[in-house]
């Protein structure tokens, strides 16, 4: 008998291995937040797990097999707030299935082929706000029993089979409904009667998404006097005429945000007819968004006339030729132009515009001055623009700018210190190349600036007054730049309100003792990815508010003894990982300090020694002061012993099952086999094993006796003992069902390796390989031994055809008969006759 302790140790990895074979996983749900949030995704559950605490609030059961939800299915979880049942093969939901979930706010049923939905299926959900029923075979809103869900805020029934847009009477009982997603259904026509409930009980905050429905007709007046917060119509129309007719049907409505267009991969219209937008004159719009249309007309002077009074305009992924001809009297306050392939920067002149986003338009290279006197927010990021002179109010035609983003552009030459832009609060230059930044105090006028990002702008800081004037700055990011002589000087004198400073990847080798003396409010300092050789703590002494200091990925060897006391008392997190620590006795004080400050150090266990050689790659925490009092010979011997013991332990752990098998072979080696074969397979292939392999071998002629884990393992016995004693020791042969699932399963490959050891120990044993499906060579080569074995030895390939099946079973039975203690001739003839009859009748 195997000792109990060894069996207990063996049981844990064996259970993980068996999860690839069983229809229900042995792995427990992932505890995301203890007692609060659990993820049970894709665990092959056939029922609601009962080992989850009743206090759970977020439960993800997606991708399981919960085909039938009975009443009170979730009564054990009264605190539940979010329940995800996506793609659980649910077909039936009974009355009161969710009864008792008084706090449930989100229910997700995406991808379930629901066939039967009881009238009281959603009863007992007094707090439900979001219901997602995407791809649930829903054919009509009339049949959806949700009229009692008065708290419902969002209803998503996209990707279903809804043909009628008629909103049921019960919508009058949903006063809080704000989002209704009907996209990707089969709605073709919309009539006045379909919206009767909105005429009677207006839902002014409702946003409606009808995208990807094949709309042909909207009855004129259907939306008259209806007020919507949002309406989305994308990839709905197969021609401009149909689109124009449908927009006419929206006449008289008031929509806060109207979205027209197509999706990138769902294009129906080759070109855009500007007459379509003329129909918008009969609508009242606040915001208009148009996306992914084809060619636009060259002349846009009158294109947006019907949108002159809108406040927000968004133009996304359009083939625009220019915007210069837009009238100046439009009342637009927010204009967004993204990825519109413009050839030159638009010289806009809007008095009303307050926010202008012009980004990812990569077909131009030169910035043109604009005149936007009331502009407060300007985003010009990602355009590959070059600025010959920056920055003052003259370029942007405004003195009211508060947000300026020029990131991810080309060369920006600094020729002005933001004269006229004193109200700026946010400034971003990251990944643009700044020129002449050291010539003068370029930020001198920006006394109101709170955020500055000059990361990766190729600045080589020489001028110590570069940050002069930034008295209100709270965040400074300047990663990826450099300093003269790789020394961080005292350049932050005016930044007395700074809270976050990022100096990563600045090639720093030294830090001036007074570099941070004027930063009393600094809380976060990033010094990672530099070239610091020592942890010099003296420069950080004035940082009385510092909480996070990141010095990871440097070349730090140690810290001088007298410096350790200078770290601020407020410091809560110090990251010293990925450095070149010396674990020599000369740094004994620092190494002891590391051990004493484990609570302060982030990832202290990951700090490793790089020298001396005998300590290389060992944890810093493994350093012992006692080693400094013994001879080098003792140290070397100790390290060598430690390595040998570690290697031995690893080898024993790695080949534990092989040793267990070897011991068992001595005990069972001479006994008679109970089974003809032990079957190794992935749980993903269990249907084939049950329906094909077991049926044809155990019910055929001659009958073979297979060892199958779900049937033949002895209850109450450790899984490891079952695998070896019942599986290998009592079987004449082993059948390995090879598939892509098998190769990708670590535990299936592990059991195959055990089978090889078994074959070696029992010379008369045999392994029969069945390739269930064609395998990609790149995937197969990942398992070198298996690839070599299949290349040099014969194996069976499953072919699902009449002739292929006949040959397959004939060859497999012949292989199994080898060594069987009865006459192979008689059985082979019987087998042949039976298969001939089966295959050719």
Swiss-Prot record:
Here the disulfide bonds are 29-40, 281-306, 390-391, 583-609, 585-628
Supply the alphabetized keyword list: Cell membrane, Cell projection, Disulfide bond, Endosome, Glycoprotein, Immunity, Inflammatory response, Innate immunity, Leucine-rich repeat, Membrane, NAD, Receptor, Repeat, Signal, Transmembrane, Transmembrane helix, Ubl conjugation
**Key word Transmembrane helix present:** yes
Give the transmembrane ranges.
633-653
PTM remark:
Phosphorylated on tyrosine residues by LYN after binding lipopolysaccharide. Ubiquitinated by RNF128 via 'Lys-28'-linked polyubiquitin chains, leading to proteasomal degradation.
Give the bilayer topology. Answer: Single-pass type I membrane protein
Positions in the Extracellular compartment = 24-632
Which residue stretches are annotated as topological domain Cytoplasmic? 654-841
Q: Which GO terms describe its cellular component?
A: early endosome; lipopolysaccharide receptor complex; plasma membrane; ruffle
Its Gene Ontology molecular function terms?
lipopolysaccharide binding; lipopolysaccharide immune receptor activity; NAD+ nucleosidase activity, cyclic ADP-ribose generating; transmembrane signaling receptor activity
Tell me the ranges holding the LRR repeats: 55-76, 79-100, 103-124, 127-148, 151-172, 176-197, 205-225, 374-395, 400-422, 423-444, 448-469, 472-495, 497-518, 521-542, 545-568
Q: Where in the cell is it found?
A: Cell membrane; Early endosome; Cell projection, Ruffle
Pfam families recorded: LRR_1 (PF00560), LRR_4 (PF12799), LRR_6 (PF13516), LRR_8 (PF13855), TIR (PF01582)
UniProt superkingdom: Eukaryota
Specify the glycosylation sites in chain numbering.
35, 205, 238, 282, 309, 526, 575, 625
Among InterPro entries, the record links this protein to:
Cys-rich_flank_reg_C, Leu-rich_rpt, Leu-rich_rpt_4, Leu-rich_rpt_typical-subtyp, LRR_dom_sf, TIR_dom, Toll-like_receptor, Toll_tir_struct_dom_sf
Quaternary structure (record): Belongs to the lipopolysaccharide (LPS) receptor, a multi-protein complex containing at least CD14, LY96 and TLR4. Binding to bacterial LPS leads to homodimerization. Interacts with LY96 via the extracellular domain. Interacts with MYD88 and TIRAP via their respective TIR domains. Interacts with NOX4. Interacts with CNPY3 and HSP90B1; this interaction is required for proper folding in the endoplasmic reticulum. Interacts with MAP3K21; this interaction leads to negative regulation of TLR4 signaling.
PANTHER family for this protein = TOLL-LIKE RECEPTOR, TOLL-LIKE RECEPTOR 4
Similarity remark = Belongs to the Toll-like receptor family.
What the protein does comes down to:
Transmembrane receptor that functions as a pattern recognition receptor recognizing pathogen- and damage-associated molecular patterns (PAMPs and DAMPs) to induce innate immune responses via downstream signaling pathways. At the plasma membrane, cooperates with LY96 to mediate the innate immune response to bacterial lipopolysaccharide (LPS). Also involved in LPS-independent inflammatory responses triggered by free fatty acids, such as palmitate, and Ni(2+). Mechanistically, acts via MYD88, TIRAP and TRAF6, leading to NF-kappa-B activation, cytokine secretion and the inflammatory response.
Recorded protein name is Toll-like receptor 4
């Amino acid at each position: 008998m195997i000792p109990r302790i060894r069996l207990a140790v063996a049981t844990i990895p064996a259970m993980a291995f068996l999860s690839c074979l069983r229809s229900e996983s042995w792995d427990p749900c992932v505890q995301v937040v203890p007692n609060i949030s659990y993820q049970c995704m894709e665990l092959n559950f056939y029922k609601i797990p009962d080992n989850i605490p009743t206090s759970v609030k977020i439960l993800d059961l997606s991708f399981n097999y919960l085909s039938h939800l009975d009443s009170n299915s979730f009564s054990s979880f009264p605190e539940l707030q979010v329940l995800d049942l996506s793609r659980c093969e649910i077909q039936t939901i009974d009355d009161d299935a969710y009864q008792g979930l008084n706090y449930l706010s989100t229910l997700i049923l995406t991808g379930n082929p629901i066939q039967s939905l009881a009238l009281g299926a959603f009863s007992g959900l007094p707090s439900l706000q979001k219901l997602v029923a995407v791809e649930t075979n829903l054919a009509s809103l009339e049949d959806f029993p949700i009229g009692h869900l008065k708290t419902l805020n969002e209803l998503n029934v996209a990707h279903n089979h809804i043909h009628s847009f008629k909103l049921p009477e019960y919508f009058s009982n949903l006063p809080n409904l704000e989002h209704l997603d009907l996209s990707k259904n089969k709605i073709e026509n919309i009539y006045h009667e379909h919206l009767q409930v909105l005429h009677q009980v207006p839902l002014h905050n409702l946003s409606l998404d009808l995208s990807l429905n094949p709309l042909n007709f909207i009855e004129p007046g259907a939306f008259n006097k209806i007020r919507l917060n949002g309406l989305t119509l994308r990839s709905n129309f197969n021609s401009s005429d149909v689109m124009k007719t449908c927009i006419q049907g929206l006449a008289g409505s008031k929509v806060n945000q109207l979205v027209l267009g197509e999706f990138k991969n769902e294009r129906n219209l080759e070109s855009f007819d500007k007459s379509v937008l003329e129909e918008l004159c009969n609508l009242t719009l606040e915001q208009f968004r148009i996306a992914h249309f084809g060619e636009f007309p060259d002349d846009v002077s009158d294109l947006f006339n019907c949108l002159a009074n809108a406040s927000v305009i968004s133009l996304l992924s359009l083939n625009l030729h220019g915007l210069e001809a837009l009238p100046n009297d439009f009342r637009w306050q927010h204009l967004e132009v993204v990825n519109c392939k413009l050839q030159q920067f638009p010289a806009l002149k809007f008095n009303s515009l307050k926010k202008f986003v012009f980004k990812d338009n990569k077909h131009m290279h030169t910035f043109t001055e604009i005149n936007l006197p009331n502009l407060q927010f300007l985003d010009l990021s990602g355009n590959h623009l070059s600025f010959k002179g920056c920055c003052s109010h003259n370029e942007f035609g405004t003195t009211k700018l508060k947000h300026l983003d020029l990131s991810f552009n080309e060369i920006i030459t600094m020729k002005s210190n933001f004269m006229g832009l004193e109200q700026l609060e946010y400034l971003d230059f990251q990944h643009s190349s700044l020129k002449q930044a050291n010539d003068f105090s370029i930020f001198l006028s920006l006394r109101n600036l709170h955020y500055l990002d000059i990361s990766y702008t190729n600045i080589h800081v020489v001028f110590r007054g570069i940050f002069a004037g930034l008295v209100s700055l709270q965040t400074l990011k300047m990663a990826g730049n450099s300093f003269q002589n790789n020394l961080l000087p005292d350049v932050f004198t005016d930044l007395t309100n700074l809270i976050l400073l990022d100096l990563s990847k600045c090639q720093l080798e030294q830090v001036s003792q007074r570099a941070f003396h004027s930063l009393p409010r600094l809380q976060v300092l990033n010094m990672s990815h530099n070239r610091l050789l020592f942890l010099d703590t003296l420069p950080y002494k004035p940082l009385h508010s510092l909480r996070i200091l990141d010095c990871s990925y440097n070349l730090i060897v140690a810290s001088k003894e007298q410096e350790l006391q200078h770290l601020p008392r407020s410091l809560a997190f110090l990251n010293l990982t990925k450095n070149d620590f010396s674990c020599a006795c000369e740094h004994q004080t620092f190494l002891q300090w590391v051990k004493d400050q484990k609570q302060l150090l982030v990832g202290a266990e990951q700090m490793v020694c790089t020298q001396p050689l005998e300590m290389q790659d060992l944890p810093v925490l493994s350093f012992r002061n006692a080693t400094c009092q013994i001879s080098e010979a003792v140290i070397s011997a100790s390290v060598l012993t430690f390595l040998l013991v570690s290697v031995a332990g690893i080898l024993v752990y790695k080949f534990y099952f092989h040793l267990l098998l070897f011991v068992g072979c001595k005990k069972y080696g001479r006994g008679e086999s109970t089974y003809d074969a032990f079957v190794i397979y992935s749980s993903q292939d269990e249907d084939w094993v049950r329906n094909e392999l077991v049926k044809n071998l155990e019910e055929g002629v001659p009958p073979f006796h297979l060892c199958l884990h779900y049937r033949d393992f002895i209850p109450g016995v450790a899984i490891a003992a079952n695998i070896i004693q019942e599986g290998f020791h009592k079987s004449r042969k082993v059948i390995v069902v090879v598939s892509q699932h098998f190769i990708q399963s670590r535990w299936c490959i592990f059991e195959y390796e055990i089978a090889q050891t078994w074959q070696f120990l029992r010379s008369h044993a045999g392994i029969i390989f069945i390739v269930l499906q064609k395998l990609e060579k790149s995937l197969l080569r990942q398992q070198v031994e298996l690839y070599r074995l299949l290349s040099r030895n014969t194996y069976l390939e499953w072919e699902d055809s009449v002739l292929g099946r006949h040959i397959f079973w004939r060859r497999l039975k012949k292989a199994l008969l080898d060594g069987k203690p009865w006459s192979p001739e008689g059985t082979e003839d019987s087998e042949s006759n039976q298969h001939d009859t089966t295959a050719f009748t």
